[in-house]
């Protein structure tokens, strides 16, 4: 999959940047970064999932370190979404859905969200869990894992746990004429494939 197609899929499938309210103007852009991997580069093996029943799960399920900065004005909470748009034959796999992250929280340490935490409300991933669930990429071409942080004007405790990605997005963008609760988004992409 070309990098152009990945970016287009991320924007279209996530419906975050285009469909939500424009990011509030700021001197510095809203940013998402990681010390575990560089944007557009391979992620280390340890971030892959561990499942003895799936030979493609070859890691330790250690969540990557994530930091975000320069949140838009009016932000009350954050959400983090992780998706593999190439997973399940192009149908996509939602590896992590987390929301209700207080505005005072601007990072997660490496491994911190591999388990439930009081710092976020766990949604429901494709795997049916609320915490980070790492890649189980088959051999061949690396998959592009998209990480998106969403700044919202929602109170951190406003949403119930267990929302799927689609349910969360529906809460974020209610039917017109109601305004979107998104204040802006930032993202990065990590690559992974099962080593030979």
Question: What is each stretch, according to the model?
Answer:
Residues 1-12:
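Bacterial N-terminal signal peptides that target proteins for export
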Residues 25-196:
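N-terminus-centered regions that define maturation/targeting leaders and the start
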